[in-house]
């Protein structure tokens, strides 16, 4: 089968200033909360990726008015709740979108059927369905809690739910369901996860009480609250900013600045880890935008050293481990990443794919059930891998960054999937001086060292 793919080659230093695309987590929540609210919500800087557009279409299907008024500028006319959709809700590849939407929809007297692409249909939804079921929602789905799934909502009761493992998506789904539940909702998390839902609920006029306890965080959402439309400025996504920043760190002579990057304290695990590795990073122009800390971050080529990442840091950088593994490949010594089993149930088994992809590029890597160990040789990476991504955008972008600094080109298949989170990735990296080219090759997957 002939498949289009992208190839990245070493092309000298990367230099320039860019702005990261809007944060994906906040973009999903802006649309969903805007649809649940009464009145107009205006959003600036929305990430216009396929994932987020799927959520926008879903909000229209649930009865909200959703209009694009300019680049990154959207208006959501909420009706104070969800109406029953007239068709199946296709969430594409958007795992965040479907889980949050199911939580929001569970509180209304409706039936809604959700599906997605082959990747999303293979991802289990049980972690979200369990608390929603305890609140009173019901559903019919495939084995293992997989899509397609029909959710029946309405008449929810209060829940006090302890997260069995860190998950901002599960926490957010419970809180969104709690908006319509009799008595609201309470969530306890032993490890703090990204708190955009709590912050944004307050921005829409809701009361949310967060208490720091010795064993974790308790979030209480009182019942009977109505949301009101508001204005939202979406900051730059740190998960997307990670790619140009790490590319600069591993490419000799490089200096790249990412403007307007979100620095939420629960999203900066990668920056902290890169700092531990000796990365030359500077943070300037720190300011507050819409209740979130935002700044400009500059990365310069650095001689990195291997480190052991604390497992408790995982929730603050769970999406960044693939690109951290690339940084580790160029570092001196061992980088140990443990407590990251969540990576196995993302868009793909990211531990397995990164381990196989790095090995295909000549990097020493050990795969573990809940982690991996990458041993770098101080800047020397052979490259040359032809990578099967299994449709995972972060696997694709991480290996392309590796190819920008490796001795031999690196190719990835299914490049169209990059648009699920970072539609302007290739153009941005080319603007900084990277050599990334699209080709139509032979059977990209069949002879790849990274098989199915």
UniProtKB/Swiss-Prot annotation:
GO terms for biological process: amino acid biosynthetic process; aromatic amino acid family biosynthetic process; chorismate biosynthetic process. GO terms for molecular function: 3-phosphoshikimate 1-carboxyvinyltransferase activity. It is found in: Cytoplasm. The keyword Amino-acid biosynthesis applies. 3-phosphoshikimate binds at residues 24-25, 29, 167, 169, 319, 346. Keywords: Amino-acid biosynthesis, Aromatic amino acid biosynthesis, Cytoplasm, Transferase. It catalyses: 3-phosphoshikimate + phosphoenolpyruvate = 5-O-(1-carboxyvinyl)-3-phosphoshikimate + phosphate. InterPro entries: Enolpyruvate_Tfrase_dom, Enolpyruvate_Tfrase_sf, EPSP_synthase, EPSP_synthase_CS, RNA3'P_cycl/enolpyr_Trfase_a/b. Phosphoenolpyruvate binds at residues 24, 95, 123, 169, 350, 394. Its EC number is 2.5.1.19. Its main location: cytoplasm. Belongs to the EPSP synthase family. Catalyzes the transfer of the enolpyruvyl moiety of phosphoenolpyruvate (PEP) to the 5-hydroxyl of shikimate-3-phosphate (S3P) to produce enolpyruvyl shikimate-3-phosphate and inorganic phosphate. This is 3-phosphoshikimate 1-carboxyvinyltransferase.
């Amino acid at each position: 089968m002939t498949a289009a793919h992208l190839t990245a080659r070493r092309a000298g230093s990367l230099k320039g200033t860019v702005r990261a695309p809007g944060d994906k987590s906040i973009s999903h929540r802006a649309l969903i909360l805007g649809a649940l609210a009464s009145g107009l919500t205006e959003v600036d800087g929305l990430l216009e990726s396929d994932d987020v557009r799927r959520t926008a279409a879903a909000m229209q299907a649930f009865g909200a008015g959703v209009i694009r008024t300019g680049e990154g500028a959207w208006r959501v006319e909420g009706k104070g709740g969800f109406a029953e959709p007239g068709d199946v809700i296709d969430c594409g590849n958007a795992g965040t979108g479907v889980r949050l939407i199911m939580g929001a929809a569970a509180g209304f007297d409706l039936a809604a059927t959700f599906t997605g692409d082959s990747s999303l249909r293979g991802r289990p939804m049980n972690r979200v369905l369990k608390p929603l079921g305890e609140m009173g929602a019901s559903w019919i789905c495939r084995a293992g809690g997989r899509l397609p799934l029909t959710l029946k909502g309405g008449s929810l009761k209060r829940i006090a739910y302890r997260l069995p493992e860190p998950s901002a998506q599960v926490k957010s789904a419970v809180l969104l369901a709690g908006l319509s539940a009799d008595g609201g909702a309470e969530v306890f998390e032993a490890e703090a996860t990204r708190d955009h839902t709590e912050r944004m609920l307050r921005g829409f006029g809701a009361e949310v009480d967060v208490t720091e306890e010795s064993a974790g965080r308790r979030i209480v959402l009182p019942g009977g609250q109505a949301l009101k439309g508001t204005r939202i400025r979406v900051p730059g996504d740190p998960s997307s900013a990670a790619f140009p920043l790490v590319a600069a760190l591993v490419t000799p002579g490089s200096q790249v600045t990412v403007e307007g990057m979100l620095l939420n304290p629960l999203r900066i695990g990668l920056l902290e880890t890169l700092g531990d590795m000796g990365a030359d990073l500077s943070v300037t122009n720190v300011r507050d935008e819409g209740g979130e800390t935002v700044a400009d971050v500059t990365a310069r080529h650095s001689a990195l050293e291997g480190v052991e990442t604390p497992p408790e840091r995982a929730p603050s950088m769970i999406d960044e481990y693939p690109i951290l593994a690339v940084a580790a490949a160029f570092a001196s010594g061992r980088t140990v990443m443990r407590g990251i089993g969540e990576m196995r149930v993302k868009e793909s088994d990211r531990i397995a794919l990164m381990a196989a992809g790095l090995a295909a590029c000549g990097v020493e890597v050990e795969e573990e059930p809940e982690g991996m160990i990458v041993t770098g040789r101080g800047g020397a990476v052979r490259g040359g891998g032809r990578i099967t991504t299994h449709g995972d955008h972060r696997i694709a972008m991480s290996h392309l960054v590796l190819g920008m600094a490796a001795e031999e080109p690196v190719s990835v298949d299914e490049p169209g999937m990059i648009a699920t989170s970072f539609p302007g990735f290739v153009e941005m990296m080319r603007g900084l001086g990277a050599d990334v080219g699209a080709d139509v090759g032979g059977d990209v997957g069949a002879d790849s060292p990274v098989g199915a």
